[in-house]
């Protein structure tokens, strides 16, 4: 089907659509500010040990408070492991006073359909960020930068147990100290 430019122009005049930048509806930033209490983000980052073993760390971060939860770390994040971590986090989120409604994640292959199903079963809508758009999950990406700069770049990690102890100490510190640079946390 071929549509001429004149037809497109005519339809756009008849319909109340403005230019792309001026259409109605909230921007991504406005959406996040309005729903900050009910949004969490999830992401992975990797850490290489001194024995050249790559470990994958799964974490969740709340948008409003910037509170971070360590889900776990493993050398092999297969479907079974990732789904089990999702179950454990979903169980703790059920005790939240403010219900979580949205989970933002990237399109990493490690996030399997069963991972998403755990959250959908609890009524949490899973929002996948656009391809190659790390800014869409900026809160999680910024946390990865923070933990690398303030902790992991200064240490030689021996194994998974050493990494988990280190991360738990950093997460406890991070959750006690106010790192939130925005007014969302106020």
Positions of the model-derived regions?
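Charged DNA-binding/catalytic regions of mobile-element recombinases
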Residues: 1-186
